[in-house]
Structures are given as C-alpha cells and as structure tokens.
Amino acid sequence: MRLPKLLTFLLWYLAWLDLEFICTVLGAPDLGQRPQGTRPGLAKAEAKERPPLARNVFRPGGHSYGGGATNANARAKGGTGQTGGLTQPKKDEPKKLPPRPGGPEPKPGHPPQTRQATARTVTPKGQLPGGKAPPKAGSVPSSFLLKKAREPGPPREPKEPFRPPPITPHEYMLSLYRTLSDADRKGGNSSVKLEAGLANTITSFIDKGQDDRGPVVRKQRYVFDISALEKDGLLGAELRILRKKPSDTAKPAAPGGGRAAQLKLSSCPSGRQPAALLDVRSVPGLDGSGWEVFDIWKLFRNFKNSAQLCLELEAWERGRAVDLRGLGFDRAARQVHEKALFLVFGRTKKRDLFFNEIKARSGQDDKTVYEYLFSQRRKRRAPLATRQGKRPSKNLKARCSRKALHVNFKDMGWDDWIIAPLEYEAFHCEGLCEFPLRSHLEPTNHAVIQTLMNSMDPESTPPTCCVPTRLSPISILFIDSANNVVYKQYEDMVVESCGCR
C-alpha cells in the first residue's frame, strides 16, 4: 500500500513542476519577469509548438488541480503575488510600463504610464531616416544655409568707387599752365611757346630712380615709366634736373670762389647696346641753384616705343669723376616739385575730344562713360541743389544770340583729376532764327533759303537752328589715366559767336 501512494505523490509533484514551468513562460508580461537563464526566442518557439493548456487538469482520483475553474479564474484576476500564477491581460487594456531603476514612483491618484503599441522603423547604424547620411561633426546642414540665404539681411551700403591717392602736380607744370593761360587771356599766341607753335600737349613724367647707398655717388640713374605715352604726333623731349646749392661742408674751397665741373648725360647701357653720350656741359659755379635742362629728342626718337626710359648722369672735374652730392644733385628727401622731370611735347593729327579723356578714365565703351558721368552727377546733386540763383526764364521770342553757360568741374565731380581750371565760362546759343535773318548771325545760303521756306509754309519746312559759328580753345591741366600730369589745349571749348544754320 505504501508503494502506490508514493508513486501517486511523485506523479503529482512532476505535474506540479511541469504546470509551474508552463505558467511561468506563458504568464510573463515582459522580459523583466522572465526567469534567469531562459532565452526569449526559445520560450516563444516552445510555446507555439505546444498545445494550449486546458483550464481544468484532473488529478488521479477525480480531483481537479488548483481548485478547479474557480481557483484558476481567481488566480487569473489577481494572483500576481503567487509564483507561477497564470494571468491573461485584457485585449483592450494597454500594457503597463515597469518602473525604471532609480526613477520617480507614480503619485497616488495618477494612472501609471502605459505603453502604446506602435509600428517602429529600424534604421541602419550610421544612417538617418529616409536614407540620408548624418551630418559630419562641425558641419552645418545645407537646409539651414539655404534658409539663411533666403532670409533678407540688412541692406548693404553701396561701395564707393575706388579712387587712387591724390597726385601732387609738379611745380613746373603749374607754372607752365599759368604762363600759357595768361598769354591766352592777353590775346597772345600761346602755341609759339610750345615747340615753334606746333605742340598742343605736354606730358610730364616724374623720376622713379634712387641713389645708391654709400658715402659717395659718382653716377645717378634717372628712370621714367613711359608705357602710357601716346606715341603719335611727338615733336620733342627734354629732361629737367634741379641742382640745389650745396652746403659749405660738401663744397670744397677753390680759386675764384667756385670750381668748374662738367656734366655728362648718357643713356643707360642694356645688354649688347652700350651707353650713348647725349650732352656735355659745364657748370661754372655752385653759388646758386637752378634747373639743368637737357634736350634728348634725338635719343628719344629711337626709344619712344619702349616702356621705360633710363638716363645716367655723371660729373667730371680735372679728368676724374666727382661726387654728385657735392654739386647739389643729392636726391635724398626731395619733394615732388624738386624731383627730376621728363617732358614730352606732341600734337595729334586728328582733333582731340575731351570726351576721349573721360572715356579713358571710366571705361572702354560709351555706355560705361555715361554711367560714370551719371554717378558723378548724383554725387554732386546736393551741392548743385543748394546753389543760389534761378535760371532765367526762356524768352521764346528772343532772336538767336549767345547766352551764359558756367561750367564748374568741381560740381560735376571731376576735381579729383582736373587740376586747373576748376571752372570756366563756356557760353551757349539760344533763340529763334526768323526771316529776315540778321547779318551778324552769319547765315549760310542754305540757311537763308530754309528760313524763307519756313516763313511761307511752317508745316513743311522746319526753321533753322541757333548754333555756335565760332569756337575757341582752352587749356586744361589734368591727371591722365596713368597718373601723369598733362597739359593739353582742347579746341572748340568756348562759344565766341552764334548764328543760324
């Protein structure tokens, strides 16, 4: 009798272990309640292969396991405290989140956090959703840059056009302009002073050479940049070097209160071409200062197509070279008006237009020139608006005559390159050309016939125009596009008389 009872007890014990294992696997809500040492994948696979567990398991002898259906339902509702209890959560009830380690506990009266079932997209490592690669460290997303580029920023101030540093004109060029302008005002022929009345343009070039460092200077090189020189219509060239009065320490004593020295001017040797002697002259005394003028036209005719002109100066006394500094030719710390000056005289065959110089300073086409003139006009609009005086009203019944026209280059914004004059009286012609035409209007035969036809039938023939019949030139001292000071005489700048044409 004892052996059957023992076998029955063993069977009950094995059934109990098997049911507890199955209940543990099927009843765990998440990984946090799985026993240690079990693998989720294996447990799920075993759960799918096994048949569903019957609610009522009969024990031998007709007794049900766990107190029948009533005990099973009780354990399903609230038997979480019992190990191995089988619980089945409701379908509509969301799963409860387990509390995080160290996290705050839910407050009384507030429902616990729940986990909603949502579809989750798995993104490969190193890639953003949508197949985009993540930005590199330190880089800025292109969408951010594009957004910043589209955003309207603060208005930018218009940049002023680049202006070169102001050029100080040589004193000789200012003196030359005053002399020739006075001759024009006095009625004299100023062109006589310009190479036998043929030249109307003088271009000046400032020396760019420097003396060698040393206690004695026996040779000086004078260098001039002539790359921007107009090569047509050249008539002459000269070199002007200022000789200052030397100090008593630099001038040795000599009989007669002075000493005689010879100056030799030659071209600089280059390559296979040796130096060519240009001029030799004597310096009788060193008690005063003055300009040494050398005519170098014969040499310059062969070198006018070069971009640079180089000349050498030496001083000889009693058959040996002497220090040029002791003769007053020291170039150290000289001002602009004291530097050596190279002058080129010329006259172009075609009539020069003032418009060409404006074109050379502003651009290469006419459109650019007009834009330059418009910009200069806008800069001076405020000063012009504040000018005193009103323009006289037009008298349409007045006959053709010369009227005042004052030109101010400073108001036009050209005072940065025009040195003199800054203003002048140009005059203009205004009025009617009616029949009969007066003799002082100097009408042509065609103008007389046209005026007669206009008086007979105004609709078929237009009237003649009041235009300048005689114009005179003016001289202008200006800075060209290469920053060289130029004296030039421009024709047809002032109206002298008006007529009908």
Curated annotation (Swiss-Prot):
Compositional bias (Basic and acidic residues): 148-162
Cysteine pairs bridged by disulfides in the record: 400-466, 429-498, 433-500
Top-rank taxon, per record: Eukaryota
GO molecular function, one term: growth factor activity
Family: Belongs to the TGF-beta family.
Chain's role: Growth factor involved in bone and cartilage formation. During cartilage development regulates differentiation of chondrogenic tissue through two pathways. Firstly, positively regulates differentiation of chondrogenic tissue through its binding of high affinity with BMPR1B and of less affinity with BMPR1A, leading to induction of SMAD1-SMAD5-SMAD8 complex phosphorylation and then SMAD protein signaling transduction. Secondly, negatively regulates chondrogenic differentiation through its interaction with NOG. Required to prevent excessive muscle loss upon denervation.
Name under which the protein is recorded: Growth/differentiation factor 5
Gene that produces this protein: GDF5
